[in-house]
Each structure stands twice: as C-alpha cells, then as structure tokens.
C-alpha cells in the first residue's frame, strides 16, 4: 500500500469507487418505489420526496462543496463526504417512517455533494492535461457501471430482501473507500489557500433551493398556489432574483475571493461544456424517466428485468469509455463528443419508433447498442474538454460549477418531462378509455373513463384498480381488468413517444452546440501552472506525481 500511495491510477480507483456510490443512489431508489409504498406504509408523495430530497440537496450544495475543497483540501472534503454518506446510508436503512427516511436522504445528499466535486478536481490535479482523457475514460466507465448496477442491483436486493437493503449495500463500499482514502490519497496542495465567500454561499444556496424546489414541487401543486399567497411562480421569481443578486455580487468580488471565479469562463470550451452538460442532463433524464415507466408499467417488466433490459447499453459504455478517453488525449474531444451525442440521439429516436404496446426486450437491442456507443463517446470528452485548461487551484470551483449544471439540468429534465408526460397521458388515456368503454355496460363507462383521466397524474403508472360494486359478476370484473390493462398500454405508448421528442431534441441541441468548441492541438499544453507539491505534515500530505 505504501508503494501505491500517491500513484495517480491508485488514487483514481479510490475516487471512482466514491463517485460510483453517489451515482448508484441516484438510480437504485427508483426500482424500490413499489416496495417502499407497501412496506413503509408511505404515500406516493412521501416516496417522491425520498427521491427528490437527495437530488435537491446535491444540486444546491455541490458548488459550495467544490469551493470548500479548494479551501480545506480535496482529500479532506472527499473523506468527510464518504463518512457522511455512509453513516446516512445506514440511517436510511434503519429509518422507522417516511419522514425519517426523507431527512436521512437529505443528509445523504449532503455527503454526495461533499465528495462528488472532489473526484473531478483531484483527477484534474494529479493527471497532466495530455493524460486526463484516459483518466476520465475510467471515470466514465464507472458512471456506466453505476447505470447498470442501480436498476439491476436494486431489483435483486428488493426481490431477495426489501427496500432497506438498497441503502445497506453502500456500507461495505463506503467503509472500504474511507480506509483506502487514508492509505492511498496524499494531501494535495494546489497553491494559495482561498477564503470562503460566505455571502456568495448564502445567496447561491438560497437561489438554487428556490429554483430547484419550484421545479421539483411544481407538478404537485399544478404550478399554482401552495398555501395562502405562496405559490410556485412566486418561488421561481424569488429564486431568479436571488440568482441575479448572486451573479452581481460575484462580479463585484472578482478581485478578491469569489465563490465562482469568472476567470473560468474565459475558456470558451469550459463555458460551452457547462451548457452541453446541462442540456445533456435534461435530455438523458427526460429520456429514461418515461422509458423506465414504459418497461415496468406498460410492458409489465419486473424491476430486475427492466434493469437487465437496459444493460446492453451500459455494457457498451463501460467497454468504450476508456478507449474514447485515450482517443480524446490524441485528437481532442470536439468531434468525438459531437459524434457521441448524435449517435445517442439516433439510438434513442429509433428506440421510440420501435417501442410498442407488445414489444419484447430484444426489440430494443439495436437501438440501445447505438445509444450505448453514443453515450460511451460523450462523458469522457465532455469532462476532459471542460477541465483541460482549468488551473489546479481552481479545480474545486470548476468541478463544483460542472456538477451544479449537471444536477440542475437533471432537475429541469425531470420536471419538464414529468409535466409534459402527464399532459399527454391525460389526452391519450382518456381517448383510449373512451374507446374501450363501449364494450362495458352503460353504468360502468363513465367511472372507467374518469379513473383513467385521474390516473394520468400518477406517473408511477399502471392501470387504475376498478372500484366494483358488491355483486359484480366475476366475468365482468375480469373484463374490466383486461380492458384496463389494454387501455393503459395503448394509451401510454403514444404519450411516451410524444413526450420523448423534447429530450431527444435537447440532445440534438447539445450536439450542435459543440460546433462552438475550439479543437485541441494534438499534444495539448495545460495552460495551468502545475500543482504545488504539499510537504509531509500533520495531515499526511505528500507530493502527487504528475506523470
């Protein structure tokens, strides 16, 4: 272990495992929603907040935690984040009620916000510019592995045990990463220690909280009044005003110690990549949200089968990402990224065309393989191009900005696509219910149509259970169940197709935006000064080899 301490690839392995945990918890909980509703006696709103509490805290605090890494050291923040995340995971697993689980998920989001930006920052510091593509290729492969492990591992654990084990699974990983961090990751100094911009932290956190809360809860309140004079539009206005004040305050502080150094955006590639990261997050989450519902609710796949159905795409991404990383180091990321985004959009577009009411998993295979080729050629060149010219002393701030744009993009994608899907479902389910209801006795027709009109607001899907009066013949009950399943499947598919036009279009916009990138030279020169080696001291800091 002593020989491996400070080795860039050993450090990368530890960072990647920590990053893996945070991504795993963004996907694994979705599979457990039905089990939580049953075992925890939770409402649908409770379970949705179990999902949103994690994402909301992560989106709000990741930019601040990135800057804290510059202040206190990336290793210190990474280790603290691992500890918080692991303890919160155990607390989630033992949560006695929905309220406690939501609170512990928020703490888990805090841990993820503490460690996530440090992974990107430390990779930027310990690897020279001409080798970062290979490093980010491994990092991207880990992201692909997490997309597999989330639905698949979640399905296995929920099937074998119950929802609590989707949190307990983090414990051995977290403990292992915590120990390995002290053994393998040296303290890293990147130059003069900055001061923390407290007013900036307060303004940024308040602005992001208001905007993200409005996006997360907007659909719940039909984008209107919450209580009294408080409404979703008012929360948005407050968030936008606070964001404007934050940006003005940051501009005024550029000569001192701002939370976001505007010097980062002098790099055209960094600016463009943040835009692409945001649009890609909107597109990817917007694509997979309706498609996952389709697999489980329309086609009747189990949680495990749904995860396995998506596995071919993720496997292609895992295999391809390291290769793309090395290729990015040689020729730059511009055209690789454009090709990857285009292939991903083509794959998802063909997936929409092939998806039908009676599709099987192998009908999706060609489309998923194309999308996997595109996805594998996306994350590595995106991150490498964005971070190539970032000075090591600003790596934490840059990583915080990148992760914030991604998380906010995910929140926007979830809210926008959720609202659009609900709108289209209200039309298509009502139309299908009216069509199928003609086969029912007259007294059952209106309640049947009304039930499906209301079911459009329940995005976890499935045909609504019929409320049958006493004495209903068994044959009629069976016919209602058959027509209900047929109505939902035939109504959901066109709603999904119409909805997915939006996120696929956003991915196309991301691909077109790459025309604005500057293509890197074949042997790029890092514009940043090299990191200042730390001296061994009380924190165990040692020099980090650059090559």
Annotated model-derived regions:
Residues 149, 155, 293, 364-452, ...:
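Small-residue-rich alpha-helical segments with characteristic i,i+4
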Residues 36-37, 68-69, 153-161, 215, ...:
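Interfacial helix-cap and linker-helix signal at transmembrane-aqueous boundaries
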Residues 179-198, 218-221, 248-257, 356, ...:
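Helix-loop junctions on the cytosolic side of multi-pass membrane transporters
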Residues 7-58, 62, 100, 162, ...:
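Transmembrane core module of solute transporters
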């Amino acid at each position: 272990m002593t020989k491996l301490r400070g080795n860039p690839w050993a450090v990368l392995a530890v960072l990647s495992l920590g990053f893996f945990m945070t991504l795993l918890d963004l996907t694994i909980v979705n599979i457990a929603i039905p089990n939580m509703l049953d075992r925890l006696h939770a409402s649908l709103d409770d379970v949705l907040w179990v999902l949103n509490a994690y994402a909301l805290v992560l989106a709000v605090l990741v930019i601040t935690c990135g800057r804290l890494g510059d202040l206190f050291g990336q290793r210190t923040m990474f280790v603290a984040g691992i500890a918080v995340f692991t303890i919160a995971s155990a607390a989630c697993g033992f949560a006695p009620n929905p309220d406690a689980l939501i609170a512990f998920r928020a703490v888990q989001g805090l841990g993820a916000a503490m460690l996530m930006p440090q992974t990107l920052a430390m990779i930027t510091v310990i690897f020279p510019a001409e080798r970062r593509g290979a490093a980010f290729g491994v990092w991207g492969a880990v992201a692909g592995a997490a997309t597999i492990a989330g639905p698949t591992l979640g399905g296995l654990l929920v099937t074998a045990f119950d929802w609590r084990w989707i949190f307990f699974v983090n414990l051995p990983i977290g403990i292992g990463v915590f120990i390995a961090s002290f053994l393998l990751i040296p303290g890293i100094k990147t130059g003069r220690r900055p001061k923390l911009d407290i007013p900036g932290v307060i303004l940024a956190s308040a602005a992001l909280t208001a905007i993200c809360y409005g996006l997360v809860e907007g659909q719940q309140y039909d984008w209107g009044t919450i209580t009294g004079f408080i409404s979703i539009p008012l929360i948005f206005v407050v968030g936008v005003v606070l964001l404007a004040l934050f940006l003005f305050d940051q501009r005024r502080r550029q000569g001192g110690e701002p939370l976001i150094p505007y010097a980062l955006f002098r790099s055209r590639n960094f600016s463009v990549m943040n835009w692409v990261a945001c649009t890609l997050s909107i597109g990817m989450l917007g694509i997979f949200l309706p498609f996952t519902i389709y697999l489980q609710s329309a086609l009747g796949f189990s949680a495990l089968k749904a995860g396995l159905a998506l596995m071919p795409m993720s496997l292609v991404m895992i295999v391809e990402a390291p290769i793309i990383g090395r290729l990015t180091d040689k020729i730059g990321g511009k055209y690789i990224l454009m090709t990857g985004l285009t292939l991903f959009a083509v794959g998802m577009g063909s997936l929409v065309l092939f998806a039908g009411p009676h599709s099987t998993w192998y009908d999706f295979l060609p489309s998923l393989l194309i999308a996997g080729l595109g996805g594998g050629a996306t994350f590595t060149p995106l991150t490498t191009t964005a971070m190539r010219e970032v000075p090591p002393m600003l790596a934490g701030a840059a990583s915080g900005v990148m992760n914030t744009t991604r998380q906010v993009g995910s929140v926007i994608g979830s809210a926008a696509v959720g609202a659009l899907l609900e709108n289209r479902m209200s039309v298509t389910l009502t139309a299908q219910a009216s069509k199928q209801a003609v086969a029912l006795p007259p007294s059952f027709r209106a309640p049947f149509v009304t039930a499906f009109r209301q079911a459009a607001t329940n995005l976890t899907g499935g045909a609504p259970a019929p409320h049958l009066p006493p004495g209903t013949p068994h044959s009629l009950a069976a016919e209602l169940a058959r027509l209900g399943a047929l109505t939902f499947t035939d109504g959901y598919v066109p709603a999904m197709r119409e909805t997915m036009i939006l996120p696929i279009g956003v991915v196309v916009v991301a691909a077109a935006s790459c025309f604005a990138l500057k293509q890197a030279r074949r042997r790029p020169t890092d514009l940043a000064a090299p990191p200042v080696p730390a001296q061994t001291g009380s924190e165990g800091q040692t020099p980090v080899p650059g090559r």
